[in-house]
């Protein structure tokens, strides 16, 4: 059994769609980044890569590479899943947490779980997505950005 931990944070900005867990969510701001800036999927990728001893998302999908400009993070997750499989690992489960004051993800949570599971060839029961706030503290609490964490177990 191998365990990996992923963390990511992105700034909220005007003029971009908000994509979380592969789902576009109605909101007045989106996340800034080279790709679609899906903070949740980036944390999932980092957790998986870490568990397999394959470094991090920046090593595999550098933000200076133009081919990743505005790429859907679901594509990055699919490629991460292929890399994990090529190393001979199977994903046991994922547990991801979004850290943000708004929007509430309850109405979108199950769709996020389904998207992540589909990208990785998993059953929905192998993927957990939840959210929390920082009670108004820090960059997420002030609404300046969003963060996400993820724990991945491989065998």
From Swiss-Prot:
<dbReference type="Pfam" id="PF02542">
    <property type="entry name" value="YgbB"/>
</dbReference>
<keyword id="KW-0414">Isoprene biosynthesis</keyword>
<comment type="function">
    <text>Involved in the biosynthesis of isopentenyl diphosphate (IPP) and dimethylallyl diphosphate (DMAPP), two major building blocks of isoprenoid compounds. Catalyzes the conversion of 4-diphosphocytidyl-2-C-methyl-D-erythritol 2-phosphate (CDP-ME2P) to 2-C-methyl-D-erythritol 2,4-cyclodiphosphate (ME-CPP) with a corresponding release of cytidine 5-monophosphate (CMP).</text>
</comment>
<dbReference type="GO" id="GO:0008685">
    <property type="term" value="F:2-C-methyl-D-erythritol 2,4-cyclodiphosphate synthase activity"/>
</dbReference>
<feature type="binding site">
    <location>
        <position position="142"/>
    </location>
    <ligand>
        <name>4-CDP-2-C-methyl-D-erythritol 2-phosphate</name>
    </ligand>
</feature>
<feature type="binding site">
    <location>
        <begin position="56"/>
        <end position="58"/>
    </location>
    <ligand>
        <name>4-CDP-2-C-methyl-D-erythritol 2-phosphate</name>
    </ligand>
</feature>
<protein>
    <recommendedName>
        <fullName>2-C-methyl-D-erythritol 2,4-cyclodiphosphate synthase</fullName>
        <ecNumber>4.6.1.12</ecNumber>
    </recommendedName>
</protein>
<dbReference type="GO" id="GO:0046872">
    <property type="term" value="F:metal ion binding"/>
</dbReference>
<comment type="pathway">
    <text>Isoprenoid biosynthesis; isopentenyl diphosphate biosynthesis via DXP pathway; isopentenyl diphosphate from 1-deoxy-D-xylulose 5-phosphate: step 4/6.</text>
</comment>
<feature type="site" description="Transition state stabilizer">
    <location>
        <position position="133"/>
    </location>
</feature>
<dbReference type="InterPro" id="IPR036571">
    <property type="entry name" value="MECDP_synthase_sf"/>
</dbReference>
<dbReference type="InterPro" id="IPR003526">
    <property type="entry name" value="MECDP_synthase"/>
</dbReference>
<feature type="binding site">
    <location>
        <begin position="132"/>
        <end position="135"/>
    </location>
    <ligand>
        <name>4-CDP-2-C-methyl-D-erythritol 2-phosphate</name>
    </ligand>
</feature>
<feature type="binding site">
    <location>
        <position position="42"/>
    </location>
    <ligand>
        <name>a divalent metal cation</name>
    </ligand>
</feature>
<dbReference type="InterPro" id="IPR020555">
    <property type="entry name" value="MECDP_synthase_CS"/>
</dbReference>
<feature type="binding site">
    <location>
        <position position="10"/>
    </location>
    <ligand>
        <name>a divalent metal cation</name>
    </ligand>
</feature>
<feature type="site" description="Transition state stabilizer">
    <location>
        <position position="34"/>
    </location>
</feature>
<feature type="binding site">
    <location>
        <begin position="61"/>
        <end position="65"/>
    </location>
    <ligand>
        <name>4-CDP-2-C-methyl-D-erythritol 2-phosphate</name>
    </ligand>
</feature>
<dbReference type="GO" id="GO:0019288">
    <property type="term" value="P:isopentenyl diphosphate biosynthetic process, methylerythritol 4-phosphate pathway"/>
</dbReference>
<comment type="similarity">
    <text>Belongs to the IspF family.</text>
</comment>
<dbReference type="GO" id="GO:0016114">
    <property type="term" value="P:terpenoid biosynthetic process"/>
</dbReference>
<comment type="subunit">
    <text>Homotrimer.</text>
</comment>
<feature type="binding site">
    <location>
        <position position="8"/>
    </location>
    <ligand>
        <name>a divalent metal cation</name>
    </ligand>
</feature>
<keyword id="KW-0456">Lyase</keyword>
<feature type="binding site">
    <location>
        <begin position="8"/>
        <end position="10"/>
    </location>
    <ligand>
        <name>4-CDP-2-C-methyl-D-erythritol 2-phosphate</name>
    </ligand>
</feature>
<feature type="binding site">
    <location>
        <begin position="34"/>
        <end position="35"/>
    </location>
    <ligand>
        <name>4-CDP-2-C-methyl-D-erythritol 2-phosphate</name>
    </ligand>
</feature>
<keyword id="KW-0479">Metal-binding</keyword>
């Amino acid at each position: 059994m191998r365990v990996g931990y992923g963390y990511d944070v992105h700034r909220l900005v005007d003029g971009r769609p908000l994509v979380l867990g592969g789902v576009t969510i109605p909101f007045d701001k989106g996340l800034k980044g080279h790709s679609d800036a899906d903070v949740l999927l980036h944390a999932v990728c980092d957790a998986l890569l870490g568990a397999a001893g394959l470094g991090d998302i920046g090593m595999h999908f550098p933000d200076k590479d133009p081919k990743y400009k505005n790429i859907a993070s679901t594509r990055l997750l699919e490629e991460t899943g292929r890399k994990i499989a090529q190393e001979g690992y199977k994903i046991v489960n994922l547990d991801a947490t979004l850290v943000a004051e708004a929007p509430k993800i309850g109405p979108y949570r199950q769709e996020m779980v389904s998207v992540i599971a589909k990208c990785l060839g998993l059953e929905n029961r192998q993927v957990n997505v939840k959210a929390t706030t920082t009670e108004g503290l820090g960059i997420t609490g002030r609404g300046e950005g969003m963060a996400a964490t993820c724990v991945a177990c491989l065998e």
